[in-house]
Amino acid sequence: MIASVRGEVLEIALDHAVIESAGVGYRVNATPATLGGLQRGTEARLVTAMIVREDSMTLYGFPDSESKELFGLLQTVSGVGPRLAMATLAVLEPEALRSALAEGNVTALTRVPGIGKRGAERMVVELRDKVDAVGSTSGAVPLGAGGGGSVRDQIVEALVGLGFPAKQAEQATDSVLAEAPESTTSSALRSALSLLGKTR
């Protein structure tokens, strides 16, 4: 099992980064906030979780152990897999997620694409007593510029990948870019996620 990866950041996309360690490039899936804290050409270290399936082995990266533990905890809920767990961490930062679960805040949880009212209620019931076991040690991860290409297209693609309908993703992206046309891809993506969360 690969518990962490440290090395030079070779590539940063909207849903993953490639980090070279000992001559091997590891593709690590991560949230926009985590990816925004990386910089191409510099050394980085991510705590990782490896998900092994019959036809794939996928690495998920996190800035700290707390986020990784929450990722694992979310998957103990029936119907929540790695993709939905990552979408949850993309919309709700660890402290906000812990608070939502501890307080039974179903509204906050349903901001995540793919989580309806019943799913949110199930998460609260199953995880409310477990979130206290997960520490609260991390700070916010700073955001940075993303890769090339059309910023709008990259953001829409990332939002659709997280489970938002294409039309909603396009509307949120257009709204964010109209207000702040000079935004970097990462900051615009965070703003679009925030906007979509409020309108759900």
Swiss-Prot record:
UniProt keyword Zinc, yes or no: no
Positions of the UniProt region annotated as Domain I: 1-63
Keyword vocabulary terms for this entry: Cytoplasm, DNA damage, DNA recombination, DNA repair, DNA-binding
Record-level GO BP terms: DNA recombination; DNA repair
A cellular-component GO term for this protein: Holliday junction resolvase complex
GO molecular function: ATP binding; four-way junction DNA binding; four-way junction helicase activity
Region (Domain II): 64-142
Superkingdom, taxonomy of origin: Bacteria
Annotated TM spans: none
Chain residue ranges for the region called Domain III: 147-200
Predominant cellular place of this UniProt entry's protein: cytoplasm
Subcellular location as annotated: Cytoplasm
Claim: DNA-binding is one of the keywords in the record: yes
Region annotation Flexible linker: where it falls in the sequence: 142-146
Family: Belongs to the RuvA family.
Description of how the protein assembles with itself and partners: Homotetramer. Forms an RuvA(8)-RuvB(12)-Holliday junction (HJ) complex. HJ DNA is sandwiched between 2 RuvA tetramers; dsDNA enters through RuvA and exits via RuvB. An RuvB hexamer assembles on each DNA strand where it exits the tetramer. Each RuvB hexamer is contacted by two RuvA subunits (via domain III) on 2 adjacent RuvB subunits; this complex drives branch migration. In the full resolvosome a probable DNA-RuvA(4)-RuvB(12)-RuvC(2) complex forms which resolves the HJ.
HAMAP family, A to Z: DNA_HJ_migration_RuvA (MF_00031)
General function of this protein: The RuvA-RuvB-RuvC complex processes Holliday junction (HJ) DNA during genetic recombination and DNA repair, while the RuvA-RuvB complex plays an important role in the rescue of blocked DNA replication forks via replication fork reversal (RFR). RuvA specifically binds to HJ cruciform DNA, conferring on it an open structure. The RuvB hexamer acts as an ATP-dependent pump, pulling dsDNA into and through the RuvAB complex. HJ branch migration allows RuvC to scan DNA until it finds its consensus sequence, where it cleaves and resolves the cruciform DNA.
Domain comment quoted from the record: Has three domains with a flexible linker between the domains II and III and assumes an 'L' shape. Domain III is highly mobile and contacts RuvB.
Name of this chain's protein: Holliday junction branch migration complex subunit RuvA
